[in-house]
From Swiss-Prot:
It holds the Pfam family S-AdoMet_synt_M. GO terms for cellular component: cytoplasm. Mg(2+) binds at residue 19. Residues 101-111 are annotated as: Flexible loop. K(+) binds at residue 45. It is an enzyme of class 2 (transferase). SUPFAM superfamilies: S-adenosylmethionine synthetase. This is S-adenosylmethionine synthase.
Amino acid sequence: MSKNRRLFTSESVTEGHPDKICDQISDSILDEILKKDPNARVACETSVTTGLVLVSGEITTSTYVDIPKTVRETIKEIGYTRAKYGFDAETCAVLTSIDEQSPDIAMGVDQALEAREGAMSDAEIEAIGAGDQGLMFGFACNETKELMPLPISLAHKLSRRLTEVRKEEILPYLRPDGKTQVTVEYDENNKPIRIDTIVISTQHHPEISLEQIQRNLKEHVINPVVPKELIDENTKYFINPTGRFVIGGPQGDAGLTGRKIIVDTYGGYARHGGGAFSGKDATKVDRSAAYAARYVAKNIVAAGLADSCEVQLAYAIGVAQPVSISIDTFGTGKASEETLIEVVRKNFDLRPAGIIKMLDLRRPIYKQTAAYGHFGRLDLDLPWERTDKADQLKKDALGE
């Protein structure tokens, strides 16, 4: 490898990974609540281990949701349907411990600082403050048609395919837990040129040989997903490199909501503010502002204003206006970063209620994002993935 070239690696996990089970349960509960009460406040955390699910958090709503039923349906859909897996939708225990949102937090969200001080009327959308302080990042680049970094894009596609061949019984001996990882080589111009390494670990039936798993996964998972032009004779494959992966899922490792935040976003290619997404309604800026930051970054790249763009937003609890907006185009910008911030402020309402309105976030759309990434999802119609602002941004930034 030339000294001016570099390697970058990202990973993904399947929907049967213990942490991802938790993300999907938390977002399933959120969606069930939002179907009946779009204004509910939800912060739902899930933990799983052998034979046990614990759902906890703060939920303020006018509706009733059968949480154990929602939990079991989600686990069944993922594929944990047999007691010998050590975790089974029918027989696992489901414990719940739910409180209401703290009134101190609710006060800040219900009516933003600016509205409480009389600067805005109660009727305006600015009357919702941020549910917490924090910083969030959004990113986009032109490496793929979905404007995502190539390593995480391929890792997600491999994980999705791993689940497809299991559920469609193309490889019926597979079990739900699995992980993928892709290492991409970049040239001196930071363009992806080849795949250096592919790693796949998949849970399986105990009677299947490692050789069969390796052969089947190359044929049915890797070859249909990975572009042939990026593979060469030096590409390395590590398929179940420990040799055996029978005990998996919550029996193998305990899982928690919010422990796959890099898988959920950009695979480490961009910075992360630390806040998780799943189980949180849109008044939580950890989620909604991260979606908005992606929306901004993607439209900047789609407009041709940069090849690569990272957007940072930051908030104070109870305050509607972001305390800061920062944009980094890594030397690829066609306009100055000051100009980009100016046109972003003009074209995007980045106050929490503005984000909710702009992206229509009070809908039950979250469970589908809880596995295989929240961004770059060509299989879903997610509002923060639209590029409907690109033309206006280009016009405002370049005067075209």
